[in-house]
From Swiss-Prot:
Family: Belongs to the GPI family.
GO terms (BP aspect): gluconeogenesis; glucose 6-phosphate metabolic process; glycolytic process
This enzyme's EC code(s): 5.3.1.9
GO molecular function: carbohydrate derivative binding; glucose-6-phosphate isomerase activity; monosaccharide binding
Name used for this protein in its record: Glucose-6-phosphate isomerase
Annotated metabolic or biological route of this protein: Carbohydrate biosynthesis; gluconeogenesis; Carbohydrate degradation; glycolysis; D-glyceraldehyde 3-phosphate and glycerone phosphate from D-glucose: step 2/4
Enzyme class: isomerase
Cellular localisation: Cytoplasm
Amino acid sequence: MKNINPTHTHAWKSLEAHKAELSNITIQDLFKQEKNRFDDYSLTFNNQILIDFSKNNINQTTLSHLRQLAQECALDSAKEAMFTGEKINRTENRAVLHTALRNRTNTPVLVDGKDVMPEVNAVLAKMKDFCQRIISGEWKGYTGKAITDVVNIGIGGSDLGPYMVTEALRPYKNHLNMHFVSNVDGTHIAETLKKVNPETTLFLVASKTFTTQETMTNAQSARDWLLKAAKDESAVAKHFAALSTNAKDVEKFGIDTNNMFEFWDWVGGRYSLWSAIGLSIALSIGFENFEALLNGAHEMDKHFLSTPIEQNIPTTLALVGLWNTNFLGAQTEAILPYDQYLHRFAAYFQQGNMESNGKYVDRDGNVIKNYQTGPIIWGEPGTNGQHAFYQLIHQGTTLIPCDFIAPAQRHNPLADHHNKLLSNFFAQTEALAFGKTKEEVEAEFVKAGKSLDDVKNIVPFKVFTGNKPTNSILVQKITPFTLGALIAMYEHKIFVQGVIFNIFSFDQWGVELGKQLANRILPELTDSEKVASHDSSTNGLINQFKAWR
């Protein structure tokens, strides 16, 4: 990948000038100027996903400059570099090949001259066999009973992705009950163990190194709990499997290495649900549905790699998002799914985006001073959010671009629930774009029989300025295929922005310092002695903790 400071490009300078030209033009104005705006600013994928980005403060000139920016930042060659196994994660000297995990064509993908696809397919075949044994009931626990509950123990990408997907695809789940434990707070594992039976529970320990502190602490507690009931070390092998590469420690734990599922250092944690880390997904929805998830992502990969920039969905979303943050001043983006099954979707891409693009040093090692990198990502399902934080989106002083996501077809046809849900989905983007003027507010009062003199003091509070940017993402139905495509779409959006920001999107050094300090502090918490080895604040907090515990 080439290292190009985006602010040094001709396109960036053109965008700065263009921003001034658009400064007095609103989204409302743009819809008046462009009669076919919906048709001209929407894209479809596979006739199953519609992306409407017309309610952004952009015109064709904006898009032209943004596409030129992508070209000047060598996006096409960066895409090629990622898909062909070049080591674009330079700080860790690794390839970035989550796309190979869902490569359904078996086209060779080379890392250091070796095709990785045979190994990828071998792990998938092993996962398929394992899933069939668990789901069919062939696999027995230590008392001869079939498995009824699966507990995935992981953290970060080993937890967020599988949990999000299993929740999103609950309509496809089988009889197995799925549980996810991540937090090192003992409450998380303790409350989970209260719900399950040691005779019929399978634990998946998801840690590449088998040394992750949070994961191994929880795994050890689960092991102790099992052995308290089984009273036989051999029971561990019947109730634990590992998603790891550390065969020595896996075996030492008591897990049969035949039930160890490998993945590779070219799979980043936040992109790992497509790998063996997705075993909990496959167990929950069945391996055929897991393959459909991979197929959807693969189709989006093909779209991203080969579709011209004008029709390229992930690239378009990335460019519009970059415009909103770097030229219109937004610092956050909200992801708002109008589907309760997608209740962890925003949290998943909070990690995906912020851990990838939350960087202040560019690929040349220079501190970034004159542009913004990754935005803050957050969100909750609609309509819950409407009764919580939409007030600020509508009438606050902070610009918050939003992605609204909704399925046209429902999984639970209850009365008119879905029409009511979708009426809110459509209404919110319309309200954010067009608002309500002072004149419209006054007209409503007059129609209700009020005099303008009586309501003049309340009118300003009921005005909505509008001009708030949104994308509407309408999915025909949330299926394994469409969910896979949606996830891959956001992954590639993040990649495109990282390329243009001139940062390394696939490392996460920012998580290391806190872990290092925690390892230093942990031994200091074992006794009652006062500490004085830190700053006064940290010393004071530790000493108060010791006094109160």
